[in-house]
Amino acid sequence: MRLKRLELWWRALWIRILVRLMRRPSAAEARPEWGSRPFRVLFLRHDRAGDMVVSSGVMRGIARSHSTITLDVLASPANASIIDGAEYVHEIVVFDKKRLGDYLPTLGRLRRARYDAVVDCMVTAPSVTTLLLILASGARYRVGIAGRGNDAAFNVTVPPETRAGAHMIDLLAALAGAFGVALDESERHPVLAVTDEEQKRAAAVWGSGFRALVNISAGTSERNWSDSRYVAVMKYLAERNPDVVLRVISSPSEAGRAQRIAHDGGGEYARTPSIRDAFALIATADFVFTPDTSIAHAASAFHIPTVAIYVRGKAERWGLYGTVGESVEHSEPNFETLDVEVVTAAISRVLSASLSRPA
């Protein structure tokens, strides 16, 4: 506990130091005329895969807000490939914040790019790394959400989303206001694309029938669900629809576990060497079941009927968005006592609802 308090104190100290170094320019230049000349804008999203997915619609909205804007994205090794080929992204800068050797080259690259504006992706709390990147970019305009205790670091601020229980996508959408646009739900909705070749490879994994994809990897221990319960879900899907084709995916580190679950549940394990391989399987599925991960966000992006399971307090901000599905939130901080019957009841409702979904 004492070590944690020291860590928080040290982080807060660095944030105060960086904010003082980043004192905003005069009010006279606080609001750019985005349509008046070309602007090169950098959106910072150097974190997890799911964060990139939930930001994708907002990034596209910013890029399309004015024909004069060229949008680059600072990504991490974990999420850079997600936006490969995205028509709204000009250039992807990959930065690994866990590698000290990446800092100086990346900071130098940002400075040489001469960005006109940089957008802070941290919409709920400030980040030392993000503030450092903003400072290093040398961008004249610094765009961020107001009210996080670091307003002095920005000269283009927008008010936060204030609705109770707002989804992370809605919190991020507030950033578009800095560019003079208000994104509706369809415009802020996550957007992903897979190539024809990726679709072809995914199609080869599926047989004929109702395509049900089960992801068993959750990323953190509290979101682990027992093998037997995943098997029970698969058997329920087979009982409900004898024509079902069951495929199981996982992170590479859990391949052995996924193979056992697939075998016991009457399905097959599908290798996904990259996250784009997983996304292609989602895009071609008829139904997805997953714990709270980027897989759930990708299913939202592709509008695939989905049931996703969440630990207490997570579904509201990180649940499914704008697709047929249910975000099942357990009452406990882990999945140890999450009953199969609760999940299969949700699956039944979602599958019934998806029958009336427009083709």
Predicted features by range, described:
Residues 1-359:
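Catalytic machinery of carbohydrate-active enzymes
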